[in-house]
Design a protein with these regions (language model features):
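Membrane-interface interhelical linkers
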Residues: 1-12, 20-21, 25-31, 36-65, ...
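Hydrophobic core positions of alpha-helical segments in small-molecule transporters
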Residues: 9, 36, 66, 90-94, ...
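Transmembrane alpha-helical core positions of polytopic small-molecule transporters
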Residues: 14-15, 41, 67-75, 98, ...
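Structural motif at transmembrane-helix junctions in multi-pass transporters
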Residues: 26-33, 77-93, 112, 172-179, ...
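Alpha-helical transmembrane segments of compact multi-pass small-molecule transporters, enriched
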Residues: 39-45, 93-107, 186-190, 222-226, ...
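Hydrophobic transmembrane alpha-helices of multi-pass small-molecule transport proteins
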Residues: 40-45, 100-103, 116-135
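Hydrophobic alpha-helical transmembrane segments in multi-pass integral membrane proteins
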Residues: 45-55, 102-117, 159-174, 218-236
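Alpha-helical transmembrane segments and their membrane-interface exit regions
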Residues: 69-74, 123-134, 186-194, 244-251
């Protein structure tokens, strides 16, 4: 199915993007990485939205903006958790929450996947946890402990990521890529405001800068593929397949 293909493309792009962003966040503050990646993604998605056409409706602005804010918060907290805590714990916990929220929302909205699909969802949930795990590295665990702060950052990031699917799923189909453009614009405004308030309003340089640019390109690809998957498939199934993105991060 075309929805499954889009979901797989989104998962791979998100997974590689998270790895790139996580590496950059271990060199500089997560917000400094996002100061580069988000504006670039906003410009790119704006150009693509104009090319794709489609009307600009209030639903695209509203749901796109809410999605962008939720994703910005999730990425900020996730990068912060990866930078401060053990990846072998942070990644699988965030991934499971990321998968559980949209599945629960889909069922609440009235989606009723078939029996085979339900079994697949359960197995996929287990797979999400397993692929998100890494073999504990003694040095990583010793220098990056799973503190209470890291735990809350991880939980918050997982829930925010899960809400991303739910919010974007509400955007009007006929608006095409416009919800993604408004998402990146709202997220960029939020990131700039928080970065200035926290003293992180400084662009990275050298390797972190290049990694941030790469993360922007991967993020744009992942978002477009996710939007297509959510329009072509059930929320509960598309979100579950996309939630397998930690497999690409680990590989």
């Amino acid at each position: 199915m075309i929805g499954a293909a889009y979901a797989q493309l989104s998962a791979v792009s998100y997974g590689v993007g998270d790895f790139v962003g996580g590496v950059a966040a271990r060199r500089v503050a997560a917000l400094r990485v996002m100061l580069v990646s988000y504006p670039i993604a906003a410009v790119l998605l704006g150009v693509l939205a104009i090319s794709a056409g489609g009307p600009v409706r209030s639903g695209a602005v509203l749901w796109g903006s809410l999605y962008g804010i939720s994703q910005a918060i999730g990425v900020w907290w996730f990068y912060a958790a990866l930078g401060a805590g053990p990846i072998s714990v942070v990644s699988p916990l965030a991934a499971v929450l990321n998968a559980a929220v949209p599945v629960a929302a889909g069922v609440a909205f009235g989606e009723r996947p078939g029996q085979t699909a339900c079994v697949g969802v359960v197995l996929a949930m287990l797979a999400v946890f397993l692929v998100g795990r890494e073999s504990p590295d003694d040095e990583d665990v010793r220098t990056h402990r799973f503190t209470r702060k890291v735990a809350w950052l991880t939980i918050g990031a997982g829930v925010a990521f899960g809400l991303d699917f739910v919010l974007l799923h509400q955007a009007p189909v006929e608006c095409r890529l416009w919800p993604l453009f408004f998402a990146r614009v709202s997220a960029t405004v939020l990131v700039f405001a928080v970065a200035r308030a926290t003293g992180n309003f400084q662009l990275p340089s050298k390797i972190p800068l290049r990694l941030a640019v790469a993360a922007a390109l991967l993020d744009s690809c992942a978002n477009i593929a996710m939007l297509m998957a959510l329009h072509a498939w059930l929320l509960s199934l598309a979100s579950m397949l996309i939630s397998l993105y930690p497999a690409a991060t680990v590989v």
